[in-house]
């Protein structure tokens, strides 16, 4: 069965993924007819899973019934004790804890807006976000309570502290256990699809973080979209006589196949879009078990994969690499894994091969999404991954993808340009940033800032971030290509490529390379190696070799700005003859 035939089958009238037309920001938009109208409806539907295990956290096991009883009780506290009303904003600042999930569900079920605070932020950053989002209440863990105490006290914002034990509380704070008492019913509130549901702050690798605002409808459409693309692959497998899931098809509520029920492990922060929407909400919606990690640790992840029979591993490429590099990897049973993947541009080919070889059944997959798309975008797995391994996949029925030139005009098939996306899953805009919203979303189209191309079959190929391209003497050097070549060297553990100012060329190519423990590799040796794989103008003229871990933010993205700034500072200390 062809891809288009499978799409037609799963979206036919009367099918679960039947299509309709809705109005989004005044524009007719193709959407799923049967998506939940709001997150409140989604959470209500999860009650049917009752005593099935939902969250597993450090020895705790929460059923769906446990979770919803806690959600109901907290929602009542928000309305009755704190006067939270539809449209009010409530901040969540904590690590990956069950209370994070409960807080999110309670806030959005009463029509309030969940504002996710990066758990890595220091007090100044927390202060900025509180001033930007102006929440009526903050729900925090003890560590975040310390950072939020002063900004909240100055503004008169109360706090609820989860898992605070008997530690003294900041002014205006109360313990979760003092307030939340199961048995209280969920307050009656009308929540609509057009209502704001979330503010997720972008990772802020450059400049000030922006709060991306999503509606209930956008999130629910994205969630059904994840399931739809799994259903499309399954339809193709069944039509060709293959068992469901044989080719590694994905989707939060796709068929279990031979592996039994699907089980997700949460290895990315809930305050970022991947952890919150496809992993947490996808598990919630589909009645799946969610194994939560407080913080990333490869050995602990292997323990949980074995003990809980985890099937879905969704993170950033470095986390799959960390698993495979763990000295105790071979002592754990990872045979339950069916999908090992993540988001963004395709992983280095060497990592893809390692995943294929290292996991008995865990086929690699990749998805392309971002905060502004609620993590939903083209996805590549199963047979498509085998035939198009360098592609990030193709869109699904509610998603439009175009490649455009700098003036916003579509380019021919195969030509390179900026990736633009449209659909009901996009954010409404940026909180308090009308100018940036207008620049980013134009006539219902999001221009992503990423460079790529589409082939004749609709497969998307990510070339690089537009701002992650080095313009060297008129030649475009794409950092992802150079990084992929560096990763092929057996002594390299990780690498980051970026541009530095150059008096003659405009920019020169630079890289920081972490050498694997016990290996020896110097800059000259790496350049000699790269000479066999890259054109000379692509080989970094500035190489910094290190054995230290390269800096990343909480979502696992490389902090290239820090590396670039460090190189620039070193450059200032050199004499012209030393450069």
Model-based region annotation:
Residues 1-15, 109-178, 517-519:
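Structural core segment of the AMP-binding/adenylate-forming
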Residues 20, 59, 146-193, 208, ...:
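ANL superfamily adenylate-forming
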Residues 34-35, 51-85, 89-97, 101-105, ...:
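Conserved AMP-binding/adenylate-forming core of the ANL superfamily
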Residues 63-65, 197-225:
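Conserved AMP-binding A3 loop
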Residues 121-128, 138-142, 313, 423, ...:
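AMP-binding/adenylate-forming catalytic core of the ANL superfamily
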Residues 222-263, 271-311, 326:
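Conserved AMP-binding/adenylation subdomain of ANL enzymes
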Residues 285, 307-315, 324-387, 400, ...:
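Gly/Ser/Thr-rich phosphate-binding loop
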Residues 535-555, 576-579:
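AMP-binding/adenylate-forming catalytic domain of the ANL superfamily
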């Amino acid at each position: 069965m062809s891809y288009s035939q499978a799409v037609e089958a799963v979206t036919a009238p009367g099918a679960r993924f039947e299509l309709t037309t809705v109005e989004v920001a005044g524009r007719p938009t193709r959407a799923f007819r049967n998506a939940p109208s709001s997150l409140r409806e989604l959470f209500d539907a999860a009650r049917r899973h009752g005593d099935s295990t939902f969250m597993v956290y450090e020895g705790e096991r929460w059923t769906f019934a446990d979770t919803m009883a806690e959600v109901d009780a907290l929602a009542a506290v928000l309305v009755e004790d704190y006067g939270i009303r539809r449209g009010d904003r409530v901040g969540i600042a904590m690590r990956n804890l069950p209370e994070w999930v409960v807080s999110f569900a309670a806030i959005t079920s009463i029509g309030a807006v969940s504002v996710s605070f990066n758990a890595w932020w220091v007090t100044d950053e927390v202060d900025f976000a509180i001033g930007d989002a102006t929440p009526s209440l903050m729900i925090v863990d003890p560590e975040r309570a310390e950072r939020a105490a002063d900004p909240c006290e100055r503004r008169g914002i109360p706090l609820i502290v989860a898992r605070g034990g008997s530690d003294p509380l900041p002014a205006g704070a109360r313990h979760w256990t003092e307030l939340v008492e199961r048995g209280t019913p969920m307050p009656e509130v009308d929540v609509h699809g057009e209502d704001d549901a979330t503010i997720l702050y972008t990772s802020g690798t450059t400049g000030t973080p922006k709060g991306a605002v999503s509606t209930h409808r956008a999130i629910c459409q994205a969630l059904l979209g994840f399931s739809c693309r799994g259903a499309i692959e399954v339809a193709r497998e069944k039509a060709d006589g293959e068992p469901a899931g044989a080719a590694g098809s994905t989707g939060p509520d796709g068929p279990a196949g031979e592996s039994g029920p699907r089980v997700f492990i949460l290895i990315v922060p809930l305050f970022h879009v991947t952890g919150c929407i496809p992993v947490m909400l996808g598990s919630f919606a589909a009645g799946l078990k969610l194994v939560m990690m407080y913080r990333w640790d490869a050995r602990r992840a292997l323990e949980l994969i074995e003990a809980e029979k985890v099937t879905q591993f969704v993170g950033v490429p470095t986390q799959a690499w960390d698993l495979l590099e763990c000295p105790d990897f071979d002592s754990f049973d990872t045979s339950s894994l069916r999908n090992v993947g993540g988001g963004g541009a395709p992983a280095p080919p060497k990592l893809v091969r390692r995943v294929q070889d290292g996991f008995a059944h865990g086929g690699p997959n990749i998805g392309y999404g971002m905060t502004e798309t609620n993590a939903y975008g083209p996805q590549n797995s199963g047979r498509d991954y085998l035939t198009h391994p360098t592609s990030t996949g193709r869109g699904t029925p509610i998603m439009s993808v175009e490649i455009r030139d700098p003036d916003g005009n579509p380019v021919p098939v195969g030509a390179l340009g900026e990736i633009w996306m449209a659909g009901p899953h996009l954010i409404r805009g940026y909180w308090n940033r009308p100018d940036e919203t207008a620049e980013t979303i134009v006539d219902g189209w999001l221009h992503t800032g990423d460079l790529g191309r589409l082939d004749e079959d609709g497969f998307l190929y990510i070339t690089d971030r537009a701002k992650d391209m080095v313009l060297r003497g008129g030649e475009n050097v794409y950092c992802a290509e150079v990084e992929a070549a560096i990763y092929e060297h057996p002594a390299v553990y990780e690498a980051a490529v970026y541009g530095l100012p150059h008096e003659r060329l405009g920019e020169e190519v630079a890289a920081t390379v972490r050498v694997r423990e016990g290996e020896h590799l110097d800059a000259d040796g790496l350049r000699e190696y790269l000479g066999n794989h890259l054109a000379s103008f692509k080989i970094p003229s500035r190489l910094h070799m290190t054995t230290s871990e390269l800096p990343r933010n909480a979502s696992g993205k490389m902090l290239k700005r820090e590396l670039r700034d460090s190189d620039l500072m070193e450059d200032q200390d050199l004499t012209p003859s030393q450069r």
